[in-house]
Amino acid sequence: MNKANLLYTDTNMKTFLFSEVSVGISANSMLFIVHICILLGENRPKPINLYIAFLSLTQLMLLITMGLIVADMFMSQGIWDSITCQSLIYLHRLLRGLTLCATCLLNVLWTITLSPRSSCLTKFKHKSPHHISGAFLFFCALYMSFSSHLFLSIIATPNLTSEDFMYVTQSCSLLSMSYSRTSMFSTAIAIREAFLISLFALCSGYMVALLWRHKKQAWDLHSTNVSSKSSPEQRATRTIMLLMSFFVVLYVLENAVFHSRMKFKDGSMLYCVQIIVSHSYATVSPFVLICTEKRMIKFWGSMFGRIVNI
């Protein structure tokens, strides 16, 4: 991407980027605070609350680092040194990977938790939190190793124009790598994401089947004049399906924008669009969780009630 194009990107795009960061940080902060309060207030906290709190914290840190990077894209005068560039971009890449991993593993835990007693997944209910924690630590180590090449390929932007590097922000540039190294890292990332997305798809298919089963039971109950009010499990299943669908749509859209950007060396507008799309899930998903969980609505209702009374 050309530096001049980066500097003169549409003002509306800058505003949208900063707005997304601000809204996402606020939403994830709210989600994190609520689940920390739930964890501290329960004698036997549920693992699902711990994982949601961790996911919201990961997304919060991701959006904060993204905000710093976006600020350096549009507002800085290129004051970061190589160590700052390497550290921030490495942390951002690591947090993006951990967000993907945490989202997929959270959906696995949700699927196991909501599975009926007759399901073959029942035997994993008590063991799943430990197994998922181990899987997350494994992926964490894997992501750290996958992103380690950034310490060699990210440099402070030099005061010259060259085809050997690509501008990331005003302060930071990415050195071009050899074809073999690029292929190796691309293949490793593709395998990692294919595995997690496949896991995501399996959970989605299972949840669709589970939701259909609930609906069929509701129809049978309705035909016998028994209340067919949605159960907490059904509401949770719909929430998970909504988040899964949104995640998959954004993932496909992000890859489409990325491949389009690769065809245009100076596609600064596409670069901004990719940033917006790739962080949309971290911004929107907390609102879905906040608005669909009754405990969270009651929590914020009581908090605002206390503020008004004061």
Swiss-Prot record:
Q: Where in the cell is it found?
A: Cell membrane
Lipid bilayer topology: Multi-pass membrane protein
Disulfide bond positions: C85-C172
The answer to whether the entry has keyword Mitochondrion is no
Q: What positions does the record give for glycosylation?
A: N159
Instruction: Return the InterPro entries for the record.
Output: GPCR_Rhodpsn_7TM, Vmron_rcpt_1
- What is the reported phenotype of gene knockout? Mice lacking all but one V1ra and V1rb gene (12% of the V1r repertoire) show a lack of chemosensory response to a subset of known pheromonal ligands and changes in maternal aggression as well as male reproductive behavior.
| Protein's name according to its UniProt entry | Vomeronasal type-1 receptor 41
Tell me what organism the protein belongs to.
Mus musculus
